[in-house]
Amino acid sequence: MQRPLTIALVVDSLSNFSNGTANSAYQLARELTGRGNTVRLIGVGAPDAQYRAREQQIPVATWFAHRQQTCFARPSALLFRRAFKDADIIHIYEPFSFGRHARDYALSHGIPVTAGFHIQPENIMYSLGVCRFIPGLSSAIYTGLYHYFYKKIPHIHVPTQMEADFLQRRHYRNALHVISNGYQPDFSPGYDAGDSIGAEEDTDAGAAHSPGSAQSPCTGKKFVIAAAGRLNREKDHITLIRAIGKCRHNKDIELRIAGTGPLYKRLMSECRKQLANTASVGFRKHSEMPRFFGEADLMVHPSIADIEGVSVLEGMACGLVPVIASSRLSAAGDFALTGNSLFPAGDSETLAQRIDWWIEHPEDLHTWGRKYAEYACRHYNIARCARDFELMERAAIRDAQGNGPQQHA
């Protein structure tokens, strides 16, 4: 039996629970602790006061970071000495100044380091307005991140094969471990997802509302469409709003978007123009998200750029059928199990057709909802993801002890 590990997770911002990176770190820490390991979270807003960092104020960059509900942590050798004492390995989430100094401190003290690739260059580019169209900017960001941060780290955690392929094409020489961020067990469909195989024959089960149990429009019940994500350009909620405006069943649809961000006013203005019913758009605590998805009939994920799209997994785990934008910059489309769950990114006409189809086929919606819940449970539950993450950490420790690099997928 292998001995438990002491793992330090380094994250710039741990204080904002609308930040997907922070949520992923917290849920991974809980699961790793449940496996018998000791986990320390280090960063701004860390739960243990002795591991809390101060925020670093960087002109312009801090303003952009706050718009993304995050911040930069200030490097501190005293903090690293305290947090890394007796640690077996350090895992760094973000390739900024705090992460780079943590990397250098750990390596200089003989502590193995791994890192995650969670910052998609396109997420940075879409914050730059028209500057995002500068030719070669994406490749330049990938190259810059490699030389600034990742080059010295042998093992990198990548949430999806799509992003691993991007890194390999851009000559990242690290061992890339493709491991989903997973979802928490709080996200469930209200029945045993493991029993969903063959459930197609039981379409009348459960009188209470459950995801995918929508009635036909003539019943008067609103058909609830859920979406979740930052209110930024690359998340493209504007396409979803315009699609609902083009739906035959516009008057039967209620839109709910969980998220905050700089486009709030613009999106609300578009909702008033396009939608027959009042939309709900705003921040939701992560603890409220299982209920948020559980009250919906369909999930739409219009994002143009996503390394993974954990909110899609969470919706699927609750038994929602997703309709996902197909984009070369988004891995979320790989979750689709049927063609009616995909539409070309930015195409509001096709998205409207998909929404109308699911509204008019409630039995298919119910059946596919069960299939999606079972698929998420089988492949993306957090227990499996934490196990694979721990295997990566142990491989990195072995390599640091001189046993040679190992590539994992």
What does each of the following model-derived ranges do?
Residues 265-284:
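Nucleotide-activated donor-binding/catalytic signature segment of Leloir-type glycosyltransferases, i.e.
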Residues 84, 150, 283-284, 291-296:
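Short alpha-helical donor nucleotide-sugar binding micro-motif in glycosyltransferases
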Residues 43, 136-205, 209-211:
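Donor nucleotide-sugar binding/catalytic pocket of nucleotide-sugar-dependent glycosyltransferases
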Residues 321-325:
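Short hydrophobic beta-strand element within catalytic cores of glycosyltransferases
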Residues 95, 304:
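Aromatic "clamp/platform" in nucleotide-sugar-dependent glycosyltransferases that forms part
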Residues 198-202, 208-209, 215-245, 256:
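Conserved donor-binding/catalytic core segment of Leloir-type glycosyltransferases
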Residues 360-395:
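A charged, aromatic-enriched C-terminal amphipathic alpha-helix characteristic of glycosyltransferases
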Residues 337-349, 357-362:
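Conserved acidic donor-binding segment of nucleotide-sugar-dependent glycosyltransferases
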